[in-house]
């Protein structure tokens, strides 16, 4: 059995519901939990926190993401790093798919650089 796995197209692993949201786990072990979240336009993931650090990447669509009270208008290609317990919410302005990677190993230290702008 290989020590890797490949997902050639993440967008084929979730369906956006007509009204609502869906979460599909792609991988889960003692280190990370990776899930695809699909939202129909107008759906919201209300304010919440995660117990571990996480990365969010918008793969499709547009969203208003609120991080610790600060609103960001984001679209495909946007990438976010959040420390544990950062209050956040996501409002899908259009049909949207987001990849969430939660770091479950509390001993992992993340060094976050400055924001990259082009």
Question: Predicted regions span which residues?
Answer:
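A short, N-terminal "cap"/entry segment at the start of jelly-roll beta-barrel domains
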Residues: 1-31, 66, 115-118
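Ligand-binding loop in jelly-roll beta-barrel domains
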Residues: 84-108
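Short beta-strand His + acidic residue motifs that chelate non-heme Fe in jelly-roll/DSBH
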Residues: 45-47, 65-66, 82, 87-93
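Conserved short histidine dyad/triad with adjacent acidic residue
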Residues: 20, 33-50
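A cytosolic small-molecule/anion-sensing beta-strand core signal
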Residues: 59-60, 75-76, 94
